[in-house]
Amino acid sequence: MKTVLWVIAGLIAVVALGVLVLYIGGSRLPREHRSQLTVTLRASRAAVWTALTDYAAMPQWWPAVKAVRMGQMPDGTELTFNMDKHGQEIPFRTVESRPNEKLVRMIANDQLPFGGTWSYELADAENGGTRLTLTEDGFINPPVFRAMAKWFLGLDTTQRDYLQHLEQHLAEKK
């Protein structure tokens, strides 16, 4: 019985030490981050723009979003509520919209442990394609989450997943 208690105490100590290391390490990382990726898509700017702004269709091609609900802020600004695969609704609002050129979307909830903007910049590419640059200017408040994102998950993992599924979606539409 004493051996079992020592093993349990040892496991608890290892987990606590791991969390402490993540907390201290995360506290030393910057709260803000920037991640930028560029892809060339085999679709016109208009087709890419439609895919980016047809929020209701997003769950059909991006598995990270299970549902989208439309809404409005008190000032009339359009909101979308994206339900993620964990059932959490995250509100987004459009900060800037220049059709076929630039779209900036922002998380519209300052109570979340993370936030920021995604900026989409579209430019002509060879053969009628589109060069899409996706920039995340974000922040992560909890130091443990910051460390996990930086060291284990990757700060650009969601962007990479999004762009991969967007590219597949546009290829299927041809």
Task: Give the positions of each predicted feature.
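Extracytoplasmic/secreted envelope proteins and their assembly/folding machinery
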Residues: 45, 49-55, 62, 91, ...
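Hydrophobic ligand-binding cavity/cleft-lining segments
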Residues: 4-7, 14-73
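A conserved amphipathic terminal alpha-helix motif
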Residues: 3-20, 131, 137-174
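Ser/Thr-centric signal marking residues that sit
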Residues: 53, 130-133
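Extracytoplasmic/periplasmic, Sec-exported soluble proteins
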Residues: 40, 50, 86, 114, ...
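Residue-level recognition of well-ordered beta-strand positions that form the cores
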Residues: 38-40, 121-123, 133-137
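Short alpha-helical
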Residues: 56, 89, 139
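Glycine-rich portal/gate segments that line the openings of hydrophobic small-molecule binding cavities
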Residues: 40, 60, 69-117, 126-131, ...
